[in-house]
């Protein structure tokens, strides 16, 4: 076949294949055109998942009648001069409308703000008709019917109407977040119509718009971000670590107001949460990057979804640093979703709040419905760290006075009605209840600390909490000096696969910075001669195996700093107070105070929450008091 020129229709259809992938792509292009025209009200109507009808109505500046044919012609635009690097509009190629008209039936109606009447043009399968008079209010109406009728093969790749409608909703929401001063409406998606009222401009207006899109729960768990470095400004809101999702659909990134799905930006976001969130969870964030258009290339993808920065390292460093700083400064702040989940668990099917009046029945357990008659408690015994089981020895969080500890039976049958000296002694000081995590009141199942604040009840996972404290202590110690080690009287020999042993031995110098002295002991074994002094006793065999797995996973993919963090996290897990270990009240309170003073203590190294707070008002609702 000889070389020849393609027809204009075929050229536009090829271009449409790059720009118009699905109905949501059409909505994106039309809504961006409306915003570029200065619209403050945009209405979107769809039908058949966008396959049969797409209509966007705006109150923007409009298109003069003599420019309507140009608007649907390829490479005709009012948004771009001769400088292709100074792009300030959302659209600029002049490809969207002609691409849509080549594969669908497009009708474009417009009436400029200073015109007495409107006109319209139609494009069907690439063939232009008009302009002709049309009755409409000031602004523009772009209507698309029978998408891909000219290229029916494309219809085979469309998803269900519900899936396409969901994609359209997502596009409208993503654009709406960046323009809170614009009123958006969306109808025809077989769901409740979307109505987003204009909220104005500024940070508060943006947060209000975000709450409209993501719900108020995000606003209750969000941290404000505002940082600038070398002419690049980062603003927006990010969720606290315990407020997360199972997918990345609630992550929004904008570059100079343009919604993007750039892997580099979302990778930096993920890096900022690396040691405070589980690997299978995703942060919720809305980030706005503002920089000189000359320092970013938005013309690297047909749909303008990806961008390329002149200095990607600067952008990544700004994102990671700003978010980490915000997380560190957030202090003690539990996710409201944690309390909601707890309430839902209490409200499981079959649960009924207790009635104020009912008949008491004696119980063999020593209490009755409506009243409590505790069984006789066991005598109190003197507690001694020297005589306690190793798993129950006190946590070393500073010197604490000795005290009398009741055994498990006594704890289970405490007489809450007795006004004796014991109750007076156990009463938490008022000043402790004023602390963010309150005063420790009890330890249940030798794993969870229950504390009381002025207006809430807090439940702390002692292992997860101490794991975070040890992890942060290890990281801080590494910045100042190598961690001191404690020599083992008899070296511990750990058998490993030969490849794992060799890999671990190559990192002996790195591990020595943590006070862990190892050396290869034959082809498939590691000799451990020294362990970190600050971690105390630990299961050396399991620690070495876990470190081997951690290094194998991250050895080639991450730098030294990231590697050190992973090693510190693994050591912290082995060096923290274990579940099943009983703590003294002084130790529990010391743990709470350390949590309040430690950044990121709301989650452990694996991203699990370290505590949950239940407000008194929520408890009262459970018991029918509210």
From Swiss-Prot:
GO biological process: mismatch repair
Any one GO cellular component localisation term in the record: mismatch repair complex
Gene3D superfamilies: 3.30.230.10, Histidine kinase-like ATPase, C-terminal domain, MutL, C-terminal domain, dimerisation subdomain, MutL, C-terminal domain, regulatory subdomain
Chain intervals with Polar residues compositional bias: 378-387
SMART domains xrefs: DNA_mis_repair, MutL_C
Source taxon at top rank: Bacteria
Residue segments, region Disordered: 352-399
Key words of the record: DNA damage, DNA repair
Annotated InterPro entries: DNA_mismatch_repair_CS, DNA_mismatch_repair_MutL, DNA_mismatch_S5_2-like, HATPase_C_sf, MutL/Mlh/PMS, MutL/Mlh/Pms-like, MutL_C, MutL_C_dimsub
Molecular functions per Gene Ontology: ATP binding; ATP hydrolysis activity; ATP-dependent DNA damage sensor activity; mismatched DNA binding
UniProt keyword Cytoplasm, yes or no: no
Pfam families to which the protein is assigned, alphabetical: DNA_mis_repair, HATPase_c_3, MutL_C
Cystine connections: none
Function statement: This protein is involved in the repair of mismatches in DNA. It is required for dam-dependent methyl-directed DNA mismatch repair. May act as a 'molecular matchmaker', a protein that promotes the formation of a stable complex between two or more DNA-binding proteins in an ATP-dependent manner without itself being part of a final effector complex.
Family the UniProt entry places it in: Belongs to the DNA mismatch repair MutL/HexB family.
Cross-referenced PANTHER family: DNA MISMATCH REPAIR PROTEIN MLH, PMS, MUTL, DNA MISMATCH REPAIR PROTEIN MLH1
UniProt name for this protein: DNA mismatch repair protein MutL
This protein's encoding gene: mutL
